Amino acid sequence: MLVEAQVTINGSKSAIWAAITDIENAAETISGIEKIELVERPATGLVGLKWRETRMLFGKPATVEKWITDAAENEFYKTRAESDGFVFLSTTSISESSGGITLSSSHDSKPQGIVARLLSIPMGFLFKGVAKKALLQDLNDIKSAVEQE
């Protein structure tokens, strides 16, 4: 199930990059995140950064361990997480055009195994709208933080 969202931000690419890569303090910027726990910090760069992220999901805390798999400064980073028979892949990217600077995020959940595949059918219909709403809220929270600086 692929979910995508984007917002246009009145700010510089470097300011947006600083906001989206401040993983350690993401709970202060993004209202949907309850808690961040850093697990592993690479010697340099972002690739290999690993953390546990706790969000409220249907009224209950849900924690998933994420890590950055690829990144290009001021352009994008990709993350991976694995939980309950699913692999979650996301890309957060910054692009510039005549219309301004756009922050985009895409999240793809891939079921692993027959049970997860069967669960993904009914959950896809229910969860896609919830996921898109949460993703857009995350992007708008980042937009607010960058535009207030």
Model segments located where?
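Hydrophobic beta-strand positions in extracellular immunoglobulin-like domains
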Residues: 9, 55, 107-109
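Hydrophobic ligand-binding cavity/cleft-lining segments
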Residues: 1-46
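Amphipathic alpha-helical segments that line or abut small-molecule/effector binding pockets
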Residues: 14-17, 136, 140
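Glycine-rich portal/gate segments that line the openings of hydrophobic small-molecule binding cavities
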Residues: 37-86, 97, 102, 137-149
